[in-house]
C-alpha cells in the first residue's frame, strides 16, 4: 500500500518494469469510496508508481547518476530503507553526506585517526569498490556515516523523489494504456486484488456488496467552437486541433529590437559553431521571415548576436552557477539593450534554463524566448517549429494569436459586458527540497476584451500553505491592469481556482473570497462602491475518475471519449454544481477529464452555459493550436507558478546557502524564507512583468 489509497501486489502476471537508473515501475490500483445519488460508489483506477530496484545501494546510486548529469545522489538515496551488509542492521538513509570514504577522517578507538575507507579495511577486511561515491548518513540524532556499497536496498519501497526526465519518459511508456485495456485490468484483476469479489463481514452486516461491472453514466459532447485569426479560419478537426498553414495572427505584436544568445555547452553535434555561423544566420532569417508573414512587426535591422561558451560541468557546482555567470556576461554585451533575446540552448539542462530565466526575469528585466539548437536547425519540421516559437513571441509582444468567432455563443456572452477571467494556482515544494522552502502563488487575468492577454502577479508564501496570502493585493494588481488597458472595470469576474483538494474548498470560500472582495474596495465607480458579480470555479485534475465510451460513435480514434465530452450526472456531487469536462484530444493512454466545481456563483450560470463557456475557452490557450485539458486561465496560472520555481531553483533542489544540502532538522524556516526572499527580490522586473513572460 502506498499512501492511503494505492495498492500494489507483486504478481508474476504483472512484474515490475525497469525504468533504469535504479528504479522500476509497479502497476497497481487506486481505490476510494465516493457518495453518489442514492448509493455509494467505489472509485477504482489503475495507477503506476516508481519503486526502488532492490540491490546494492552504491550500484543503484551509480546507475542513477549515470542516467543524467542533473541527477544528484541525495535525490536518489534520501529516505530509502537499507540493510547494512557488514552488521545486518536495518537503517534509513537520512541524507547523503558531502564527504567521500577516502577523504572523511575520524578517531577510532582501535585504529586512531583513519579514513572511512581505511577503517573498513582494517576492521572488516572490506576493500571499497566505490570510494568515489559520497557517504550516506544512516544515524538518528547523531550522524552515522557509511559507504553506500555496504547497504542493500530493501524491496517494495516507493520512490518519493522527483523523477529524472529520462525516468519520466520511461514511466509514460509503462503507464499509458487505452481505456479499454485499463478497464479490463480493473474488472479482471483490480476487483480481486482489492478484495471486492466477496463482501467482507462488516459489509454483509450492512447488506452491502460491490458490483462487478463499470458504472454507466449519461454524458454529452459539446461542439468545438470556430476559431478566428487575422487571416484565415482554420478547421478544427476531430482531435480538437488545427493547422497554422497560411495563417496570420489576429493581432500582430511589434518587436522593436532583438538579440540572439547562442549557448555553447559541449554539444557540438547540434550546436551552432559561432555567432557568424552561416547556418545560424540563415536560420534566423528564416525565422524572422515567418514572423513577418504571421503578422508580427519585425525590426528592419538584423539582430545582435553573442555567444556564451559555458564552463564544463562540475559536480562541485551542481546548479551550474558559473554557467549562469557566463551567460550574464554575454547578455550585457548586447548594446543597446534589446526588447527581447532569443536564446538558443545547447541542450535541455534544467539548471541552465532555470538560472537563465531567473537572471533575465528578476535581475536584468530582459524578455527571453528559449529554443533548442537541435530543433531549430533541423530542416525537417523547421517551419512548424518556427511557427510554434512565433506563437509565444507574439503573445510576449502583447499580440493576439486567435480568438473565438464573433458568432460563437460564448464569445457573445463574454462581450455583453466587461468581463474578467481569472486563474489562480499555488505550487508547493516537494520531496527533496529544503525544508521551509516557500510555496509560490500566481494570479493571472485578462486585460483585453479578446481574452487573450493574461499577465500575472506572483508571490511567495509560507511553505505548503494552500490559501493564497496576498490574494487581495494580486487581485488589485490585475484589476488595475484591466482598468488601464480596457478603460473600465469588469462588471463580472469569473475565477478558475486550480490546485485545491475537495477537503479545502471551504478555505477558498471562507479565506480567499473575502480577500478578493477586499481588492474590490480599492476601486470606485461613478455609481459608488465597486461591486462586480463574482463566480468561483475550482478546477481539479488530481482525481481518479475516467470515462470510456459505451458506443463507438462517441469514441475518438484512440478509444477515448471525443473532445468536448461532459458528464454532470451519476458520478458528480449529489447537491452541488459540478461537472467533468474533457475538452482536449488525448495524446496517448487514457485521457483524464478535468473536474470543475462551482463553489460560489453570483453570475448565475446555467449548467449548459458554464460548460460550453469552459469548453470554448479551453480552445483559447495562446501557445497551442489545439484545445487544452485545463481551462486556459487556470493553465496560465499553473505556468506562472512553474516559472516562479526557476527563481527558487536551488532551494527546490535541496541546496541552501545556509550550509550545503540540508534536512528539516538543520534548516530554520525563517532563515530559508529570508534566503528565498533574497532570490525572489521584487519579482519580475518591468516591463517584462507586464507581459505574458511565463509562456
Regions found by a protein language model. Give the residues of each.
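Long, low-complexity, intrinsically disordered terminal regions
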Residues: 1-695
